[in-house]
């Protein structure tokens, strides 16, 4: 599984003109399931995402996870947005191939599992809609962006 994460001061996602998810300071994660991914891979990616230290401590060092963005125990928001294009094969030609992405039904199942697991472990979780045409707005803080990938 793949997550492209961005530290944000705010972010939201809209589908058909309505807001489906919105957070203040926290992480926007674009999430993709690849062929062969499992719930174990989703669990591993979620653990990495929730523990990844990208927020600054009192000394200005990236040392705090999304569960403690201010060093005083305040959890940041987590906005999870499905994005199968992260698995694109761009090695040949001028058109990406999405063969490496999980089939839509499997991708939806794993994304739903990932969201449910995140909600069980983190207090502020918002989402987009799997498979929908979404408009994502964000203010990238830093900018700070990381590519996280785990194999099944």
From Swiss-Prot:
CDD domains: Dtyr_deacylase. Its EC number is 3.1.1.96. It catalyses: glycyl-tRNA(Ala) + H2O = tRNA(Ala) + glycine + H(+); a D-aminoacyl-tRNA + H2O = a tRNA + a D-alpha-amino acid + H(+). It is an enzyme of class 3 (hydrolase). It comes from the Bacteria. A motif (Gly-cisPro motif, important for rejection of L-amino acids) lies at residues 142-143. It holds the Pfam family Tyr_Deacylase. InterPro entries: Daa-tRNA_deacyls_DTD, DTD-like_sf. It is found in: Cytoplasm. An aminoacyl-tRNA editing enzyme that deacylates mischarged D-aminoacyl-tRNAs. Also deacylates mischarged glycyl-tRNA(Ala), protecting cells against glycine mischarging by AlaRS. Acts via tRNA-based rather than protein-based catalysis; rejects L-amino acids rather than detecting D-amino acids in the active site. By recycling D-aminoacyl-tRNA to D-amino acids and free tRNA molecules, this enzyme counteracts the toxicity associated with the formation of D-aminoacyl-tRNA entities in vivo and helps enforce protein L-homochirality. Homodimer. Belongs to the DTD family. HAMAP family: Deacylase_Dtd. A Gly-cisPro motif from one monomer fits into the active site of the other monomer to allow specific chiral rejection of L-amino acids. This is D-aminoacyl-tRNA deacylase. The lineage of its organism: Bacteria, Pseudomonadati, Pseudomonadota, Betaproteobacteria, Burkholderiales.
């Amino acid at each position: 599984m793949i997550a492209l994460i961005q530290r944000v001061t705010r972010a939201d996602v809209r589908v058909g003109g309505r807001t489906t998810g919105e957070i203040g300071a926290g992480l926007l994660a674009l999430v993709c399931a690849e062929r062969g991914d499992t719930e174990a891979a989703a669990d591993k990616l979620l653990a990495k995402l929730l523990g990844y230290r990208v927020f600054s401590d009192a000394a200005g060092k990236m040392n705090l996870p999304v569960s403690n963005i201010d060093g005083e125990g305040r959890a940041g928001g987590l906005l999870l947005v499905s994005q199968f294009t992260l698995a694109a094969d761009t090695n040949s030609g001028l058109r990406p191939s999405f063969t490496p992405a999980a089939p839509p039904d499997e991708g939806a199942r794993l994304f739903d599992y990932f969201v449910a697991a995140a909600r069980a472990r983190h207090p502020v979780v918002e989402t987009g809609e799997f498979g929908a045409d979404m408009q994502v707005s964000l203010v990238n803080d830093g900018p700070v962006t990381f590519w996280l990938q785990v194999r099944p």
